Curated annotation (Swiss-Prot):
It holds the Pfam family DUF2463. This is UPF0328 protein ECU02_0090. It comes from Encephalitozoon cuniculi (strain GB-M1). It comes from the Eukaryota. The lineage of its organism: Eukaryota, Fungi, Fungi incertae sedis, Microsporidia, Unikaryonidae. InterPro entries: UPF0328. Belongs to the UPF0328 family.
Amino acid sequence: MAVTQGIDAHTINQQHRIVIRNFSSFVSLIFTFFACYTFSEHDFKEDLFFRFIVLLPSFSYLILQYLIFFHTTWKGYCKTESTLRNILHSTLIVLLLAFVIINIFSSITFVTDKWNSEDLFFYSIILPSFFIPPTYLLSTSCDFITTSFTATGINILVDLMILLSYLTFLLLLLFLEKAEYRPYFILASFVLILVKSLKEIYLPSRESSSPAASWRVIIFALVFTLAVITHSLSAYVSISTLARYFRLSATGEVLSIS
């Protein structure tokens, strides 16, 4: 009886983890969308609390996810005779910890920065769409121990569609001045994440347990590289914002944060 109860409890915990893992990203996105179209630009320009509220879901999701990645990678990896593999996993652990620090630092910097009228759309729509999709893929379809992409069946197609939509959005955001097309790819990622989340909750798929094929390692490397790029840009913007703050302070100008 005790064994049966233990198995049932473990099954329930697994189901709860699946729900939280799949829906946390979706909730983060929908909350910021809701905030953008519910409150006025004046609210966010004048009130530090509103800025904190609009950024809290996304950065809470990012910080918690990368803390989980860091913990599981650090605890789950066993050293091997391969020096290269040991170096790779040590680098992963350091980068994951760096991502946690960057997200904490960026959340503080972005909240306290002075917002212009157009910044509401950027922080509530563009910024979550910039960070969340690669983090979602790392959370639901990647294994840091085997450094591979683990999706199977229809999830492979859905994940590749999320990845393609995100890459197109990134291209439009960073290299092409095609702002009118960005909402379509933001919406595409949003819908695909919702579809996969619902599918995994009600019809969960098994993860690949076979030795990592080359294409699985390549997809993992691509998704993780995207996470490195997004966090590098976030760190750069945060440091630039902080430098501007100190520069204004040194010249006697006041930088309003409320």
